From Swiss-Prot:
Annotated function: Catalyzes the synthesis of GMP from XMP.
Main enzyme class: ligase
Native species: Prochlorococcus marinus (strain MIT 9312)
Annotated protein name in UniProt: GMP synthase [glutamine-hydrolyzing]
EC number from the UniProt entry: 6.3.5.2
InterPro entries (UniProt xref): Class_I_gatase-like, GATASE, GMP_synth_C, GMP_synth_GATase, GMP_synthase, GMPS_ATP_PPase_dom, Rossmann-like_a/b/a_fold
UniProt entry tagged with the keyword Transmembrane helix: no
Keywords of this entry: ATP-binding, Glutamine amidotransferase, GMP biosynthesis, Ligase, Nucleotide-binding, Purine biosynthesis
Metabolic or biological pathway: Purine metabolism; GMP biosynthesis; GMP from XMP (L-Gln route): step 1/1
Pfam families in alphabetical order: GATase, GMP_synt_C
One cellular component term from this protein's GO annotations in UniProt: cytosol
Amino acid sequence: MSQTSLKKERDPSILILDFGSQYSELIARRIRETNVFSLVVSNCISIEEINDINPKGIILSGGPNSVYEKNAPKCDEKIFNLGIPILGICYGMQLMVKELGGSVTSATKKAEYGRAPINIDQESELLSDVEDKSIMWMSHGDSINCLPDGFNKIAHTENTLHAAISNDRKKLFGVQFHPEVIHSEFGITVIKNFVYGISSCVADWTTETYIEETIPRIRDQVGNKKVLLALSGGVDSSTLAFLLNKAIGNQLTCMFIDQGFMRKGEPEFLMNFFDKKFHIKVEYINARERFISKLKGITDPEQKRKIIGEEFIRVFEEESNRLGPFQYLAQGTLYPDVIESAGTNIDPKTGERIAVKIKSHHNVGGLPKDLQFKLVEPLRKLFKDEVRKLGAALGLPDEIIKRHPFPGPGLAIRILGEVNNEKLDCLRDADWIVRDEIKKAGLYNDIWQAFAVLLPVKTVGVMGDKRTYAWPIVLRCVSSEDGMTADWSKIPFPILERISNRIVNEVVSVNRVVYDITSKPPGTIEWE
């Protein structure tokens, strides 16, 4: 089927031009939370491309540069004459001011970082229902010195004269603060005012409409060809399996490679769930001994990751040739993966990477270029929280939708040092106890990750009046919104006590449990 015959994908209602901000992705997420579809695109997008998309509104993101610097990122200045509402955030506001004849200078002496109360100077549609003196999040070292003609100052702070500006006639607006950040008290109100009140968007980005639009596109793309999916049991690949099964049925084959590093009972649960309960075709590949033999004598974590990734490739290639031929490879690529791998080199029309290549999935580790698959990536425009909602709508249980993140190399990188079957059995039992007690306490859904780590040392203990010399287990529990930063979870002592007592009494070769109270940064969530 030719590419031109495929069903057209929906265009974003709001375009976000990325100038290098750490918050560009967050802006898109906040807008989607209001049920409006948005995409992050390059700041170099052409006027022709914008007109082709015909968005209802445009947001210019923040960025680390100063607009008065040589080679500072810009956009086509004709964008301000399209008649499309525009909101500039931080750098985006300063760029708009400079391009339209105003001036921006360094605010070294009055730089503003963190929380700051804003003072509203005059009524504006942008700041409707925003309380005066409310707290907004500032992060800037430059400030506006002079506004362009037609603009008004609508808010200020103690150190920033132009905290918000507007040109109502041209529907051009700017804020020096970051409304997308959770610390901004009325930030979501500002976003809704721009998206709904100013840009007249419609709340039509829902899980139901996504399913209705995506299934026909999958059928158009695939036709009657066969599709292969590497199933890990995580929320991404599981949701994708359900979506593809709904779209193309038995044209889908899932391959589950059991490398021996999964948590207790997971392989059995996944096979029973997908194959027996929902009758989704899953090929189970038992490669446990193959993987464990490759790690003999290996202690370096990066070597372990590399070996596991390379062996996965070999197994995947062998089994796909045996089971195939397959014309399509399905991947659980998400929108953050697209943004990260492409930077701002994203096709503004499709939201895809401009130079498409097979992505290094967390379980695949980079597939061979000569596999000659065409890609099916129906989740590539979704964020993680949207995938969870999609999974729920498709019938996935909470056991999968709300499961904690789990690294591709699995328990192999939660065993520090060399990996062997004895250590794997020990860690599986300890890890199961951790999660079991966290669930019994009703804390599982409040914690980002809770797991056990096995250290490559032994400690002295006393059990039954006898000296012991056994492994210590580290308990790692963290709270986070996205995994980028994390704080150690303040689990009540009685729960920690139960976990410790059970591990030292029920797990062979363990005589000590310690609790990791390190945040990220400076530490990472995983130990390896």
